[in-house]
Amino acid sequence: MQFLDFLIALLPALFWGSVVLINVFVGGGPYNQIRGTTLGALIVGLGLLITGFAKFNNPTVIIVGLISGALWAFGQANQLKSISLIGVSNTMPVSTGMQLVGTTLFSVIFLGEWSSMTQIIFGLIAMILLVTGVALTSLKAKNERQSDNPEFKKAMGILIVSTVGYVGFVVLGDIFGVGGTDALFFQSVGMAIGGFILSMNHKTSLKSTALNLLPGVIWGIGNLFMFYSQPKVGVATSFSLSQLLVIVSTLGGIFILGERKDRRQMTGIWAGIIIIVIAAIILGNLK
């Protein structure tokens, strides 16, 4: 593995972790944010179409791409709703943990990914670590009863719904063997359609939507770096490194967006992030 290839493999985490930070920074609320983000992803998809990476000779790629893209938009829209309630630093570790648990359980139960006792043992260890990490990142501040906070409870319910969309986005591609740059254009079309449907009955503005194009472009470019790095460093390594996005988004929420945390919460966040990343590395190497 070349050092440059390793650095490029880190870029998806940087790009994907920055998406929600830019969404919140430019503002506009979750409906402008999802519409703008999905249209931004479509811009990258159109670039692939123009350069000849989108092929129309495989109906499976087209259909799976469209549906999985719409599912991603559903997951992202609900994640943005959670962020509007409890912030980036509270949402992203929980969302990342839920996604890893959801995709892993589906792959194990329905796709038979863990076929050996070693995989089962290490997989269960990783799942326990994920739950522990998520719990640590969600520690309440002193004198705060977070479990009685209606916004926190509502956000957790929204994140469960969000996870369904994200898991569907990932596992559909696995089930039908669809992925890579061939599918990205059709996924981006599905995202744009999904983003429009999800926001059509809500008040949006052209300015706020336009400002949120950038996160979508960044998300699409992060995907391209992922596709480049997988054959260079391996699927397991690229997957594990991409999960470092939770560090970028969580710490960005605290230090860039100014979300306040006390010492106890910061200790829990650092410990939780490290544990979630370790679990992601274990899961990545079980693939």
Curated annotation (Swiss-Prot):
Cellular location(s)? Cell membrane
How does this protein lie in the membrane?
A: Multi-pass membrane protein
Q: Which GO terms describe its cellular component?
A: plasma membrane
User: What family is this?
Assistant: Belongs to the GRP transporter (TC 2.A.7.5) family.
Q: Where is the signal peptide?
A: none
Q: Does the keyword ATP-binding apply?
A: no
Write down the species.
Answer: Staphylococcus aureus (strain Mu50 / ATCC 700699)
Thylakoid among keywords: no
UniProt cross-references to PANTHER family, sorted A to Z: TRANSMEMBRANE PROTEIN 144
Q: Quote the protein name from its UniProt record.
A: Probable glucose uptake protein GlcU
